[in-house]
Amino acid sequence: MNLERYTEQARQAIAQSQVLARESAHSKIDLPHLAAVMLRDAAGLPAKIVQKAGQNPQNIYQAAQSELGRLPKVSGTEGGQYLSSRLASALGRAEKLADELKDRFVALDTLLLALAETGYGGLQASAVRQALQEIRGGRTVNSEHAEGTYNALEQYGLDLTRQAEEGKLDPVIGRDEEIRRVIQILLRRTKNNPVLIGEPGVGKTAVVEGLAQRIVKGDVPEGLKGKRIVSLQMGSLLAGAKYRGEFEERLKAVIQETVQSAGQIILFIDEIHTVVGAGKAEGAVDAGNMLKPALARGELHLIGATTLDEYREIEKDPALERRFQPVFVDEPSLEETVSILRGIKEKYEVHHGVRISDPALIAAAQLSHRYIADRKLPDKAIDLVDEAAARLRMALESSPESIDALNRRKLQLEIEREALKKETDAESKFRLGELEKEIADLEEEIRKQQAEWEAEREIMQKLRAAQQRLDEVRTQIEQAERAYDLNKAAPLRYGELPKLEQEVNELADRMAGAQFVRPMVTEEDIAAIVSRWTGIPVAKLMEGEREKLLRLEDELHKRVVGQDEAIVAVADAIRRARAGLKDPNRPIGSFLFLGPTGVGKTELAKTLAASLFDTEENMVRIDMSEYQEKHTVARLIGAPPGYVGYEEGGQLTEAVRRRPYSVILFDEIEKAHPDVFNVLLQVLDDGRLTDGQGRTVDFRNTVIILTSNIGSPLIFEGIQSGQSYETIRERVFGVLQQHFRPEFLNRLDEIVVFRPLAREQIAAIVQIQLEAVRKRLAERRITLELSQEALDFLAQRGYDPVFGARPLKRVIQRELETPLSRKILAGEVADGAHLYVGSGPLGLTFEARPTAVA
């Protein structure tokens, strides 16, 4: 026996037989070892041949295993060192069969045929030989990896026309122009290879699926009728090709099978750019070069699909590119997207077992178009519908909230009951009796609601089963009508179909009044998914949120004292956005806050972020003092190609891509280089910015706040000379126009000059600052009370019209926090104490009281 004459898979089978004999402690390798190894994999080549020969491979495998269990075991010496005479004779016969079949190597299927000729396991040699020849398709074994080339299209391809016949493809709505153009190119004599080019998610693969469905229906010109579209899986072709030349052999077999079909098979390669360089190794030929000759001669019909960016890979090889005809697939319009969603709705309803309302489909198209900027229609709209239906299905299959709440209440009462059982006093016994009654009432209510929910769920499951059956019947009708089998089609179309449609409608009507199960996907469900994906609140306003928006000024005034103009301007912009009246192509609002230091410009931005998002974390703060040089603009939008940090993206663009709904604060903008403002022009006007990598970032759901100290000297001058606020404002605007370009100022929604703080406002700020001190003391359970004199002392010491509220912070630190920290460290103020702060001739006085005064 010359092992070099065997293919790689045949050698592996013999080696594994030896391993099996050794593990089983059998002295010889025999026919059952080889049979068990060959038929172990139900999807392997030997199992397929046995099945094609009309026998069950699993039965033969089980018989081989039982025979192995009966063979005598040896001990003391290592097993599997000899071939049995039966196996040696079978291997000799396999080599002779290879010569008869004109093979250069003994393949795995030849071994199986030799096994069949011994009569092992009841295998019929003639049937196995016929199956072998069918699978080989007239080819001979000329390489060590020949098995990988048998039935290459079946192994490495997916028949889209067969899937269309079985109703496994989603309906393709629209795209008629693209499908017609593909058909036109396929009917050419040479270079009849269309390549679909478009952005990810616009429906390139759907065009090919639409063509497969048209071929099945016969809705194509004569030249395409009866043809098969096979999608080639490049991953399967490459997977497991360990040895040089194995990948090329597989691809060659695919090309040969396609060419031999005499134009009956059209290959479809999704992500066709992967064939350029696929399988390339030193001295090897890549897939693209192997396809060229057959493509040029028109023997190979090929449809490709790739994105605009990745088509460049093919453009690098002009000889390959000229063999393709590009077909551009554009993003569908909103109306077309809604039509597509209506067409595929039924498939999703059947899969999830829920109904999808038409307004939900319209909302999915509109909201995805408006809020999900980095993806394309119809893909993003379909994803929204799919996820909303999955979310509803998950809710339907879990216990309703009302039953959960009752169960939690019952558990709480049961814990209380167990505690009261140990008490003996009359009051506890009375309470125990009340508890028993309440628990019994709860159990009754839970039982009642549980029964209702179970009944509704049962109807829901019946509805899902009926929808699935309806879908199956429609597919069967289509198949019967295509085959002109009217005896089968008529009873289905006029008997079973109307009956099932009526059943589905009746069950849907019964579900309409359901208390616990809501089987309909609505606009609110779609809006909730959009909010979860993007963080943008697009759901309908709840009553609480309406109140909050109407009282937004009061919320902002809690932390920002005075500055009514600025607060009203910001609050109005937020209300316009949430009511849906803002310009859809601009940010929610863009404001320039001017004024002296310490009057609340930055604090207002922080407060707005906290009231919109319940946390200041959602504020993107960019300190413009870091952007004083021209080249620092690249830090905002990302470095250009070829520079360090190109992959990282910009500080501004990346922050907004991750959180499209946020407050962006550009602090101290007058300190930045003038070129930075050129970047902001597009953001303020169109609500978009292109980063260093060419991606468009959407700023339409951001609030942009810029702060500046420009004109501060004029404000100080005006305050000291007693000028009115209006006069100061006019003078500040004059300075502003000298510093910033008109096109920048013209794009801002509002320019607000903050007023200097008055003495009364400082008194209100004292209370806000003290609240922060109280929060820090709360960790030690120390409460703080200040007399009116102490408050007046802090306000008077902290008032400085030129420096705003910041000196007040320093006064509180010096006069209150520092002496207080000394007293805590000295042990004069214990944890849990109540501290009373008064005012004396030398400053603040501290008196620790043991308990808090009510």
From Swiss-Prot:
Residues 332-535 are annotated as: Linker. Residues 3-147 form the Clp R domain. It holds the Pfam family Clp_N. Residues 382-513 form a coiled coil. Residues 83-147 are annotated as: Repeat 2. CDD domains: AAA, RecA-like_ClpB_Hsp104-like. One of its GO terms (biological process) is protein refolding. The keyword Repeat applies. ATP 2 binds at G595, P596, T597, G598, V599, G600, K601, T602. Residues 545-756 are annotated as: NBD2. Residues 757-854 are annotated as: C-terminal. Gene3D superfamilies: 1.10.8.60, Clp, N-terminal domain, P-loop containing nucleotide triphosphate hydrolases. One of its GO terms (cellular component) is cytoplasm. Residues 6-71 are annotated as: Repeat 1. It is found in: Cytoplasm. ATP 1 binds at G198, E199, P200, G201, V202, G203, K204, T205. One of its GO terms (molecular function) is ATP binding. Its main location: cytoplasm. The keyword Repeat applies. Residues 151-331 are annotated as: NBD1. It comes from the Bacteria. Homohexamer. The oligomerization is ATP-dependent. NCBIfam families: chaperone_ClpB (TIGR03346). Part of a stress-induced multi-chaperone system, it is involved in the recovery of the cell from heat-induced damage, in cooperation with DnaK, DnaJ and GrpE. Acts before DnaK, in the processing of protein aggregates. Protein binding stimulates the ATPase activity; ATP hydrolysis unfolds the denatured protein aggregates, which probably helps expose new hydrophobic binding sites on the surface of ClpB-bound aggregates, contributing to the solubilization and refolding of denatured protein aggregates by DnaK. The Clp repeat (R) domain probably functions as a substrate-discriminating domain, recruiting aggregated proteins to the ClpB hexamer and/or stabilizing bound proteins. The NBD2 domain is responsible for oligomerization, whereas the NBD1 domain stabilizes the hexamer probably in an ATP-dependent manner. The movement of the coiled-coil domain is essential for ClpB ability to rescue proteins from an aggregated state, probably by pulling apart large aggregated proteins, which are bound between the coiled-coils motifs of adjacent ClpB subunits in the functional hexamer. This is Chaperone protein ClpB. The lineage of its organism: Bacteria, Thermotogati, Deinococcota, Deinococci, Thermales.
